[in-house]
């Protein structure tokens, strides 16, 4: 079954042909470990976990190498460490922040049903590779030293021979457009506004390492060079797939291409570039100022969103209802709908043995067409094919959820209490209205009598 993927660079869907079918290689940009991951961060984790699972199915579990990095050196980490542990030396407080945040990230994405990557390298473990690449770039005339910084020159790249790609090709921007669109002051040590930092001097107390390019003072890497170094170390100069969020296309991924191709004199860093779309919450951009900023942990463990906690399988399915390249609107209604499907499928497959699911796989091989995939899951349910549905859920990392293991949210509890009060005062019109509102939330109300003959109301998640 042929796999077709949309390539951000060529702007077209193409047949996927790995450089080496016995060693399929994928790199995805991972978290900067300074705080809990938010729901927008969960989207690429889930999307590329599905792709990882599909590649393992198509090429064999032992023939796919998935690398997702951990960024553990960054200004945001330094600021968080100084704020949370003011009494400790900065290096020690940074270690506490990064180790704790990495554990939190793993707990959260494990709950979402995601497999661990084959390799999960930390940036600080690859400083030597970063220095090697930087030295090559300086020697090749693509980078220069200024005021103890090392900067990359996109202009030098575009003036070089035709083997190299054009800087700006991935983001479909020209250098002139980038210069015209610059909205920040250009540092005085830069030769050109588009030049970007490969290495910079460390401030007193900050993490620091011996510098490349003959610089006497110690320093630390820029963000972009980290991923070039880690992908090179674990996947080679050129590999099959590079993924991440659409917000990383420029400047991060554009700069990765520039660094890697110029350092290794290659025309491509990755054969296929894949990017997932943006996420908004209830129709608005997610932001702390709007009060709609929500972390994975808050969705799993608190009642912040929709007035209740949510199971990881529900979050996963809700994320997959929208095609990965399209923007997604994260809503409580979508979570209720996903949960209803999960409960139904879980009940239906509880005694099933995982079977083949060719139609589901066919949908996924069409550029991860998860809306079509979900339609196929519903079709299997309607056709009574429990084994096939069970196999599809297993392939997709959708864990069965036992009915009753999800807490009833505060809003629903309040509505049920209000309906009970309405029935007690014989306000049946209000009682029926609340019943319909609960039904719209996926909660079925049943009225009956207890062993003493007194009225009693029970509820269940509707099928």
Curated annotation (Swiss-Prot):
The listed location of motif 'KMSKS' region is 285-289
Q: Which InterPro entries match?
A: Cys-tRNA-ligase, Cys-tRNA/MSH_ligase, CysS_C, Rossmann-like_a/b/a_fold, tRNA-synt_1_cat_dom, tRNAsynth_Ia_anticodon-bd
**Annotated compartments:** Cytoplasm
Entry's cofactor comment: Binds 1 zinc ion per subunit.
Question: What GO cellular component is one of the record's annotations?
Answer: cytosol
**UniProt keyword terms in alphabetical order:** Aminoacyl-tRNA synthetase, ATP-binding, Cytoplasm, Ligase, Metal-binding, Nucleotide-binding, Protein biosynthesis, Zinc
Q: Name the principal localization, coarsely classed.
A: cytoplasm
- Binding of ATP: at which residues? 288
EC id: 6.1.1.16
Gene Ontology molecular-function annotations: ATP binding; cysteine-tRNA ligase activity; zinc ion binding
Q: Which residues bind Zn(2+)?
A: 29, 227, 252, 256
What reactions does this protein catalyze? tRNA(Cys) + L-cysteine + ATP = L-cysteinyl-tRNA(Cys) + AMP + diphosphate
Show where the record puts the motif 'HIGH' region: 31-41
**Entry cofactors:** Zn(2+)
Query: Any one Gene Ontology biological process term?
Result: cysteinyl-tRNA aminoacylation
> Mind telling me which Pfam families this protein's record contains?
CysS_C, tRNA-synt_1e
UniProt family annotation: Belongs to the class-I aminoacyl-tRNA synthetase family.
**What does the subunit comment say?**
Monomer.
Q: What is this protein called?
A: Cysteine--tRNA ligase
